[in-house]
Amino acid sequence: MAIHYETKATNVGGRKGHVYTDDRALDIDIVSPAQADGKATNPEQLFAAGYASCFNGAFDLILKQNKVRDAHPEVTLTVRLEDDSDSESPKLSVSIDATIKNVISQEEAEKYLQMAHEFCPYSKATQGNINVDLNVNVVD
């Protein structure tokens, strides 16, 4: 199996600590969501940013492969930390909300969004592990 990319991140101090990547492109303080002050981030924000970016790349690729031009997809990913009835620790759930320009029908947009979900590496990694809601809006 060929590896397409590999990166490393190191955390010191957990949710009240610091995280950095091996190339220091990311080098930031970490806090728990309850202590967010705008000067540090938390694991849920980092997950949302990574998943949104990866998913939008997949969505844009699927649109282009299907000859949909000028759709200008935008993806907002909401990560929720919620109670888990099966465990004392919380669990994650996400909503993927995409918006594209009115160059295809709502039905086509939903089909391509589902295809992107099946293609996206983050979606593959979370499949069967977290609840994911998919939504797409076609706008003027």
UniProtKB/Swiss-Prot annotation:
<dbReference type="InterPro" id="IPR036102">
    <property type="entry name" value="OsmC/Ohrsf"/>
</dbReference>
<dbReference type="InterPro" id="IPR015946">
    <property type="entry name" value="KH_dom-like_a/b"/>
</dbReference>
<dbReference type="Pfam" id="PF02566">
    <property type="entry name" value="OsmC"/>
</dbReference>
<dbReference type="GO" id="GO:0006979">
    <property type="term" value="P:response to oxidative stress"/>
</dbReference>
<protein>
    <recommendedName>
        <fullName>Organic hydroperoxide resistance protein-like</fullName>
    </recommendedName>
</protein>
<comment type="similarity">
    <text>Belongs to the OsmC/Ohr family.</text>
</comment>
<dbReference type="InterPro" id="IPR019953">
    <property type="entry name" value="OHR"/>
</dbReference>
<dbReference type="InterPro" id="IPR003718">
    <property type="entry name" value="OsmC/Ohr_fam"/>
</dbReference>
